[in-house]
Structure formats: structure tokens, C-alpha cells
């Protein structure tokens, strides 16, 4: 049995020793030449500076009311409870200035940083328009704050999802995907 395994490993090493062929160039539907590297953008490097991200949809441009409404519909179809939270620009991201890392007052929350809840969770919410009106009210009250919509599952007793629904007008943290890579 050992001799059989050795023979297989020898065959594998001979296959690996073959010289690499140049990447296969193919034409896409539009007639442009593509290679493996351009298909998966595998040669790009993530920009580590000024590339802040929030939660689920933070890589996308700001969501429209229609897109938010579709997400809220999905939340309500799954019987999850929507809830709005907001935070000032300087408190929205985890950092040494606004997080207590260790000590007697440190909680067991993921980064020991909380956003302020807007009113109470919307337990009786049945329509996306109710959530959109609360987003507008929160935006009117705190125009310079980040506002996110989170949803909770009462059965599993966990937060299911969270995404930004409002960025402050002065925010410069969003970048196009092409600008996030070098």
C-alpha cells in the first residue's frame, strides 16, 4: 500500500513540474479580451487607509428609500423586529477613543460600543412605510448622525442584520469599489 502511495506522489510531482502556460485569453460577450486575472480581480490590493466599512451593505452606495423598503419587507416577512439606532460621526466607528477595551466597566458586547436606540424596537410593525417614516423622523432630529436599521429575531434572541440607512452629509467615508483597491 505504501508503494502505491509513493507512486501517486511521484506522478503528482511530475505534473506540478510542468511549466506554466500563459493565461488563456478569451473574448467575452462584448468582444473584449479577458483573462483569469481580470475576471476575478485577483491581482488587486485592498486599500487599508480611509476605507471604513459598516455592516451588511456598506460596500454599496447609499440605499434609496425603495431599496430600504425591500429590505424592510424581507425583515417583516421573516417575523423579525426592526429597530433604528443612531450615533454621532465620531462615535460610529470602533476606535480607542470611544471604546473601553478592558476594565471593570467593559461589557461583553462585541466592541464595547453602543449606538443610541431611536425610540423602542418596532414590535408591532406591519408595513415598510412605518419604518421609512421613523427613518425620516430620526434623520430630521439628528441630521449629522449615522443611522442604521437593525433587526432582531425573538426566537433565537439575536440580532440578525444591520445596515446603514443614513450617512451624515459631511461624511466622506464612502468610496466607490474601484477606489477601495490599489
Curated annotation (Swiss-Prot):
Q: Where in the sequence is the transit peptide found?
A: 1-41
| SUPFAM superfamilies documented for this protein | RuBisCO, small subunit
Q: Name one GO molecular function term.
A: ribulose-bisphosphate carboxylase activity
Q: Name one GO biological process term.
A: reductive pentose-phosphate cycle
**Transmembrane annotation, as ranges:** none
Pfam families named in the record = RuBisCO_small
Keyword Nucleotide-binding on entry: no
State if Oxidoreductase is listed as a keyword: no
Subcellular location field: Plastid, Chloroplast
Keywords attached to this Swiss-Prot or TrEMBL record, sorted alphabetically, are: Calvin cycle, Carbon dioxide fixation, Chloroplast, Photorespiration, Photosynthesis, Plastid, Transit peptide
Q: Which SMART domains has this protein been placed in?
A: RuBisCO_small (SM00961)
Q: Name one GO cellular component term.
A: chloroplast
Concerning InterPro entries, the annotation shows: RuBisCO_ssu (IPR024681), RuBisCO_ssu_dom (IPR000894), RuBisCO_ssu_sf (IPR036385)
Which family does the UniProt entry place this protein in? Answer: Belongs to the RuBisCO small chain family.
Q: What else is known?
A: The basic functional RuBisCO is composed of a large chain homodimer in a 'head-to-tail' conformation. In form I RuBisCO this homodimer is arranged in a barrel-like tetramer with the small subunits forming a tetrameric 'cap' on each end of the 'barrel'.
Q: How does it assemble?
A: Heterohexadecamer of 8 large and 8 small subunits.
Protein function: RuBisCO catalyzes two reactions: the carboxylation of D-ribulose 1,5-bisphosphate, the primary event in carbon dioxide fixation, as well as the oxidative fragmentation of the pentose substrate. Both reactions occur simultaneously and in competition at the same active site. Although the small subunit is not catalytic it is essential for maximal activity.
Q: Which protein is depicted?
A: Ribulose bisphosphate carboxylase small subunit, chloroplastic 3
The organism is Acetabularia acetabulum
Its organism's taxonomic lineage begins at:
Eukaryota, Viridiplantae, Chlorophyta, Ulvophyceae, TCBD clade
Gene name for this UniProt entry: RBCS3
Amino acid at each position: 500500500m505504501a508503494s502505491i502511495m509513493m507512486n501517486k506522489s511521484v506522478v503528482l510531482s511530475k505534473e506540478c513540474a510542468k511549466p506554466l502556460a500563459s493565461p488563456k485569453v478569451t473574448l467575452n460577450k462584448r468582444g473584449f479580451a479577458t483573462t483569469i486575472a481580470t475576471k476575478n480581480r485577483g491581482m488587486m490590493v485592498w486599500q487599508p487607509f480611509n476605507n471604513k466599512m459598516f455592516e451588511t451593505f456598506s460596500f454599496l452606495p447609499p440605499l434609496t428609500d425603495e431599496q430600504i423598503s425591500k429590505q424592510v419587507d424581507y425583515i417583516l416577512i421573516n417575523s423579525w423586529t426592526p429597530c433604528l439606532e443612531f450615533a454621532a460621526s465620531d462615535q460610529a466607528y470602533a476606535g480607542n477613543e470611544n471604546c473601553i477595551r478592558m476594565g471593570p466597566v467593559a461589557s461583553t458586547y462585541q466592541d464595547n460600543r453602543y449606538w443610541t436606540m431611536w425610540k423602542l424596537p418596532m414590535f408591532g410593525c406591519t408595513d415598510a412605510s412605518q419604518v421609512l417614516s421613523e427613518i425620516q423622523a430620526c434623520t430630521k432630529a439628528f441630521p449629522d448622525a449615522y443611522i442604521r436599521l437593525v433587526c432582531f429575531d425573538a426566537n433565537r434572541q439575536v440580532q440578525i442584520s444591520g445596515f446603514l440607512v443614513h450617512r451624515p452629509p459631511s461624511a466622506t467615508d464612502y468610496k466607490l469599489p474601484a477606489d477601495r483597491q490599489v
